[in-house]
């Protein structure tokens, strides 16, 4: 159980494990009709690898299966968010050849609600990442990458999704070790010291 506050009133979030993750918001002893479900679908570390693999005569992974699942849940449930926690790039021959552009085009079809920058998003360089962000039809966020000469943020630091009267805040942060990997980009830094 996680505890959040909304207008100074405690709100408990219960995450139920299973094929889907449901978050139920409880305030005191309210009746079931006042409880809202929020389904959060999450993926990360796709690394530009979009093909399913045959494991024990079953297809595992792949964007077509992921897309089918995300679309199925979006049709069956109310209040569904799909989020990607980075590392969309670098790992497949196709992604490397097209430097992430092919990946972004496929991600656009998945229509995530929000994406954070992961450690491999910087592999093609910060300037290319900013170009790729312009190709995305979804928000890409990061709160701590900035230009060292003027402290200008490279990305929007957060994204708020409003759904069924709920406001869900997403914040994207890279660790210092990831930022250190971009050391050849001397003008890029972090607000974290």
Model-derived features: positions:
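Cationic, low-complexity basic patches in intrinsically disordered or flexible, solvent-exposed regions
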Residues: 7-10, 22
């Amino acid at each position: 159980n996680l505890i959040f506050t909304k207008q100074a009133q405690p709100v408990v979030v219960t995450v139920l494990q299973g094929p889907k993750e449901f978050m139920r918001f409880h305030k005191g002893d309210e009746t079931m009709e006042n409880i809202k479900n929020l389904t959060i679908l999450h993926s990360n570390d796709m690394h530009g690898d979009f093909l399913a693999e045959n494991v024990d005569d079953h297809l595992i992974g792949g964007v077509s299966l992921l897309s089918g699942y995300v679309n199925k849940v979006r049709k069956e449930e109310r209040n569904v968010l799909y989020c990607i926690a980075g590392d969309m790039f670098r790992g497949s021959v196709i992604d490397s050849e097209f430097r992430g552009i092919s990946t972004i085009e496929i991600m656009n079809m998945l229509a995530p609600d929000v994406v954070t920058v992961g450690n491999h998003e910087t592999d093609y360089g910060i300037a290319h990442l900013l170009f790729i962000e312009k190709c995305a039809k979804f928000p890409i966020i990061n709160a701590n990458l900035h230009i060292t000469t003027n402290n200008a943020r490279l990305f929007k630091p957060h994204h708020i999704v409003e759904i069924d009267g709920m406001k869900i805040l997403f914040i994207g942060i890279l660790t210092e070790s990831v930022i250190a990997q971009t050391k050849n980009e001397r003008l890029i830094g972090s607000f974290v010291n």
